[in-house]
Amino acid sequence: MLFDQIASNKRKTWILLLVFFLLLALVGYAVGYLFIRSGLGGLVIALIIGFIYALSMIFQSTEIVMSMNGAREVDEQTAPDLYHVVEDMALVAQIPMPRVFIIDDPALNAFATGSNPQNAAVAATSGLLAIMNREELEAVMGHEVSHIRNYDIRISTIAVALASAITMLSGMAGRMMWWGGAGRRRSDDDRDGNGLEIIMLVVSLLAIVLAPLAATLVQLAISRQREFLADASSVELTRNPQGMINALDKLDNSKPMSRHVDDASSALYINDPKKGGGFQKLFYTHPPISERIERLKQM
């Protein structure tokens, strides 16, 4: 059951990434068709923009991410309990020892960052270290180390980059339509009025309008799948599903973080640091903790 869940989560992630690339290609084709008389040209431009966005975000410095979240680096002397747990989990996962940070915040939370295991880091809040016992801390750090081993940060970064590229292209197309660019393009087209042309025009407009929302939903779906995968992978490392269940139960009862956390960083944490409600739940980067616990109980 454990390995079935891991395989299923990986498969779903790759399907969602494929959907992402198709969305980007669709928007690029639509923009090219409407404004430069070449859908294929627009598609190529969109893929290049997405590639540049992804590269620029993947190589963002770990120091920048940690600084944005108010984290300070610790070592074996200053935080021996946390350091040794991370060391043990990294050893079991067969990855290099990540750098270790602490965030001074009473909320219970943790996250990992780094585009690959060679430049990765993990951070935990002081509140988490004060409340979690050894088994629960191992489960949480196993979750974060699993994100590193599974290259989740890189995958999530690619998803954010593609969503940003889609939103940028759609916004650019909207501004051009506002200033009459599409109207001039269509009026100059000697095939204007052809039935197929009208259908293509409508489809292109719908793609430009709806793609940003679709991209956001796909991005969130990828983030949720990687959380499920990290939970299951943590159990694979610790061989202790109850430790992960107990840790998630405590995380669920934790208050929101006291410091502001930007949207990009929110997706990194093991528990959504904002804890919004109502309509905001549709745009959570994390699956409900109750659902995560239920999946662990089925192992």
Curated annotation (Swiss-Prot):
| Record membrane topology | Multi-pass membrane protein
> What is the annotated localization of this protein?
Cell membrane
Q: Which cofactor does it need?
A: Zn(2+)
Q: What EC class is this?
A: hydrolase
Q: Please list the residues that bind Zn(2+).
A: 143, 147, 227
Any one Gene Ontology MF annotation carried by this entry is: zinc ion binding
- The transmembrane residues are 15-35, 39-59, 158-178, 198-218
Gene Ontology BP terms: proteolysis
Query: Where is it predominantly found?
Result: membrane
Q: Name one GO cellular component term.
A: plasma membrane
How the cofactor is bound: the record states: Binds 1 zinc ion per subunit.
Supply the alphabetized keyword list. Cell membrane, Hydrolase, Membrane, Metal-binding, Metalloprotease, Protease, Transmembrane, Transmembrane helix, Zinc
**Active-site feature positions:** 144
Q: What is its EC number?
A: 3.4.24.-
Say which family it is in.
Belongs to the peptidase M48B family.
Q: What is this protein called?
A: Protease HtpX homolog
The species this protein was found in = Streptococcus pneumoniae (strain P1031)
Originating gene: htpX
